[in-house]
């Protein structure tokens, strides 16, 4: 294979892994970083941090590949997805499965490098969740909740990496992530609702129906309440809650965008959730930095 052909192949694989659309990586990364900082009380092991960041990129990429494999017959009927490499026939199903297996193997090797038995065991359901999520859209009324577990499974793994155990706090944080994922992915599903109804797949936007906007805002509220409760249980300071306050304001802006149920504003709100995750993370980091200097 000559260089131009190889370059074109690499570009197709990059698109299949959605490396050109990093929002999914960020939505997966922020909860993992929350957990790494909270579990280490603001002093995470930097080797662990970098391994989790790289693992997040690899597993999100693997998730995109298997998602396109599962949805290849549906995507051709959706305007936004009909040109994806697998659906368009530019990448074969064998190539996609091989790429998914390779990315999953690399992620597992990263976990093995940590040398933590509990993290290794937790990586097994993490891979299962990533691989099985795309198929839940065929029978589960709110597959976004399943996505929240899959996207958030780095949380218990992060606690296990730092503490050697997974305390209740980690599971509460995972639950918060489930509600956050239902919120932002419902916004995403609102974009494709008409197409999804035609092809017969299930989404939260369809299930919630005319209560979709209210459901999004309720899920946002539960997310903030759970994270706030975690902060209270850990005796966190003003900066922690300031991060939540900023996130609350951002969520309020999202309401103004999604209440009209128009495609582009809903998609804009989905993308904007990056700033929700970042705001919460900055609040956590700053709070630990300030409390470490006894400034509160």
Curated annotation (Swiss-Prot):
Primary localization class, coarse: membrane
Domain of life the protein comes from: Bacteria
Reaction equation(s) it catalyzes: all-trans-octaprenyl diphosphate + 4-hydroxybenzoate = 4-hydroxy-3-(all-trans-octaprenyl)benzoate + diphosphate
Protein family (similarity comment): Belongs to the UbiA prenyltransferase family.
HAMAP family (UniProt xref): UbiA
Residue spans crossing the bilayer: 22-42, 46-66, 99-121, 139-159, 163-183, 211-231, 238-258, 270-290
Annotated function: Catalyzes the prenylation of para-hydroxybenzoate (PHB) with an all-trans polyprenyl group. Mediates the second step in the final reaction sequence of ubiquinone-8 (UQ-8) biosynthesis, which is the condensation of the polyisoprenoid side chain with PHB, generating the first membrane-bound Q intermediate 3-octaprenyl-4-hydroxybenzoate.
Record InterPro entries: HB_polyprenyltransferase-like (IPR006370), Prenyltransferase (IPR039653), UbiA_prenyltransferase (IPR000537), UbiA_prenylTrfase_CS (IPR030470), UbiA_sf (IPR044878)
UniProt KW Transmembrane helix keyword: yes
Keywords: Cell inner membrane, Cell membrane, Magnesium, Membrane, Transferase, Transmembrane, Transmembrane helix, Ubiquinone biosynthesis
Compartment(s): Cell inner membrane
E.C. number: 2.5.1.39
GO cellular component, one term: plasma membrane
Record Pfam families: UbiA (PF01040)
Biological-process GO terms, alphabetical: ubiquinone biosynthetic process
Named cofactor requirement(s): Mg(2+)
A GO molecular function held by the record: 4-hydroxybenzoate polyprenyltransferase activity
Pathway the protein contributes to: Cofactor biosynthesis; ubiquinone biosynthesis
Gene, per the UniProt record: ubiA
UniProt name for this protein: 4-hydroxybenzoate octaprenyltransferase
Topological relation to the membrane, as annotated: Multi-pass membrane protein
NCBIfam families for the chain: ubiA_proteo
PANTHER family named among the record's database cross-references: 4-HYDROXYBENZOATE POLYPRENYLTRANSFERASE, MITOCHONDRIAL, PRENYLTRANSFERASES
């Amino acid at each position: 294979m000559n260089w131009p052909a190889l370059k074109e192949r690499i570009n197709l694989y990059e698109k299949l892994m959605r490396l050109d659309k990093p929002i999914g990586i960020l939505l997966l990364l922020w909860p993992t970083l929350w957990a790494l900082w909270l579990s280490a009380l603001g002093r995470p092991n930097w080797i662990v941090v970098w391994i989790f960041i790289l693992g997040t990129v690899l597993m999100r990429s693997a998730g995109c590949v298997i998602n396109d494999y599962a949805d290849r017959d549906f995507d051709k009927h959706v305007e936004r997805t009909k040109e994806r490499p697998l659906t368009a026939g530019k990448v074969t199903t064998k190539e996609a499965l091989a790429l998914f297996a390779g990315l999953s193997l690399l992620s597992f090797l990263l976990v093995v490098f940590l040398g933590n038995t509990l993290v290794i065991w937790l990586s097994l359901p993490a891979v299962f969740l990533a691989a099985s999520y795309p198929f839940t859209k065929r029978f589960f009324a709110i597959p976004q909740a399943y996505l929240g577990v899959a996207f958030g499974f780095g949380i218990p793994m992060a606690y296990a990496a730092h503490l050697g155990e997974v305390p209740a706090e980690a599971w509460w944080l995972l639950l918060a992530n489930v509600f956050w994922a239902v919120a932002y992915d419902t916004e995403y599903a609102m974009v494709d609702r008409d197409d999804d109804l035609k092809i017969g797949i299930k989404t939260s936007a369809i299930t919630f129906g005319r209560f979709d906007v209210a459901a999004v805002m309720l899920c946002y509220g539960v997310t903030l309440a759970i994270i706030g409760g975690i902060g209270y249980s850990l005796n966190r300071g003003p900066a922690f809650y300031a991060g939540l306050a900023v996130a609350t304001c951002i969520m309020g802006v999202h309401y103004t965008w999604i209440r009209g149920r128009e495609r582009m504003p809903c998609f804009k709100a989905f993308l904007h959730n990056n700033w929700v995750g970042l705001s919460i993370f900055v609040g956590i980091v700053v709070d630990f930095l300030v409390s470490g200097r006894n400034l509160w």
